C-alpha cells in the first residue's frame, strides 16, 4: 500500500491531473503526469472505471498490481501527480506483463529521477 503522502486522493487533484497532465499512451492504460510546483513528493492514483470491468474484483486486482509495482521506487519519481487510467485490455495481461508495461511507460515518460 502506498503511504499517505504518496496518494493522490482529492477529487479536484485527480481531475486536474487527468485534464491538464501530459499523456503517455499504452495499449493497456494511459499515464497522465502533471508536474508539481515546489518540492512535494510524487503522488499517484490508479483509475479503473466500470468500463474496464463490471466486476470490482478485477478492477481492484489491476489497481493493486500497479500500486505494488510503483511503491518501491516512488521515492525516485520526479515531483508531480501521476494518474494511471486503465483500459479494459489490461485484464488480458498477467501480473508480470502488467508490471513490465508499467515500468516501460515510466521509463519512456522520464518520470524517474536521473
Each model region followed by its residue ranges:
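Positively charged, solvent-exposed patches that mediate nucleic-acid binding
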Residues: 1-114
